Amino acid sequence: AARGRTCCSVSSGDEEFCFPISIPEMHAIRGAGQGGDECFVLVPNSPGFVEQLGFLMPDLDIGTAFPEQGSHWRLATTAQGDCVFLGPTGCMLDREVRPTYCRLFPLWQFRGQLTWFTAAECLANEECSSLAAMLEAMGTGGEEIRTLFREMCAKLGLDTDDKVNS
């Protein structure tokens, strides 16, 4: 985190695209004594936000879970655009209570296939040129990523049934 921008930072004006956090995830963070109300922000489901989620999860019904007139929670950010839980050496949350998206990143499941985000600011992306290398660097395996992805979707009210389990 001390090297510069990370996945835990957003550019000014891009806050609407921050990934949503579920109510159970908020409760877990609060229950662990690691965050109060000021760590979470309730924001409207903007058209850009819904479109971005639809791009990331094209097989799921984003509009039902995040209706146009609705809202969702996300982690708060500082004036500099950093997640409120980002410290000088990375995330200050215990791994067990981190939002599922944060535990997944930069790994992802897209149309049933494992992949990873190749954002320039991703430090892991600098060192990994294959999915196998990324999984090893993140200390995980494909089945764990699929499980986390299903868990994240379920917490957000996104029905995955057989759509993303291939």
Model-derived features with residue positions:
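Short loop/turn segments that flank or connect secondary-structure elements
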Residues: 1-166
